[in-house]
Amino acid sequence: MKLDVFAGQEKSELSMIEVARAILEERGRDNEMYFSDLVNEIQNYLGKSDAGIRHALPFFYTDLNTDGSFIPLGENKWGLRSWYAIDEIDEEIITLEEDEDGAQKRKKKRVNAFVDGDEDAIDYRDDDPEDEDFTEESAEVEYDEEDPDDEKSEVESYDSELNEIIPEDDFEEVDINEEDEEDEEDEEPVL
């Protein structure tokens, strides 16, 4: 790959974020890229080893999120913020949601160059099967208001557990005399 923006510059002096911006600018607006594809193209351009990319990957992802010129487009796709007007960003999100209502799209199997040789690595792009089972019907679960009978049964079960520990026969009856307490509060301390 040849990027005209960096003609005459030493590749070792370029940052991954600069190369990512140049790659996305060269591809154009309708060619958003998956994060893994973007990283692979950066690696090919810079000629870095797998170990070098693995080491720099967390820093690059942080820079990608904090740099104001990139925008996540969902499903781990990235584009340049300059491609979208502020009002258009919401429209893009809405159109993505409308597309999901239609026919299901077949998912492409993506190969991650970083996970192939490492059995312990986790591929975060894999969807959970639980996510696929989610439907709007399951989102509309109705919750009943608090049932006073449930509270009563909780109190009864608590009382029965207490009775197992200390039988009711062992409790002493205590009379609370509220007048005595009021009298004590009214009295002035003697000095």
UniProtKB/Swiss-Prot annotation:
Assembly description: RNAP is composed of a core of 2 alpha, a beta and a beta' subunits. The core is associated with a delta subunit and one of several sigma factors.
Described function: Participates in both the initiation and recycling phases of transcription. In the presence of the delta subunit, RNAP displays an increased specificity of transcription, a decreased affinity for nucleic acids, and an increased efficiency of RNA synthesis because of enhanced recycling.
Protein name from the UniProt record: Probable DNA-directed RNA polymerase subunit delta
Every HTH HARE-type domain range: 14-83
CC terms in the record's Gene Ontology section: DNA-directed RNA polymerase complex
Source taxon at top rank: Bacteria
Region (Disordered): 119-191
NCBIfam families recorded: RNAP_delt_lowGC
GO BP terms: DNA-templated transcription; regulation of DNA-templated transcription
HAMAP family reported for this sequence: RNApol_bact_RpoE (MF_00357)
Family (UniProt): Belongs to the RpoE family.
GO MF, any single term: DNA-directed RNA polymerase activity
Phosphoprotein is among the record's keywords: no
PROSITE patterns named in the record: HTH_HARE
Gene3D superfamilies, sorted: RNA polymerase, subunit delta, N-terminal domain (1.10.10.1250)
Organism name: Streptococcus pyogenes serotype M6 (strain ATCC BAA-946 / MGAS10394)
Keyword Transcription found: yes
Pfam families for this protein: HARE-HTH (PF05066)
Keywords: DNA-directed RNA polymerase, Nucleotidyltransferase, Transcription, Transferase
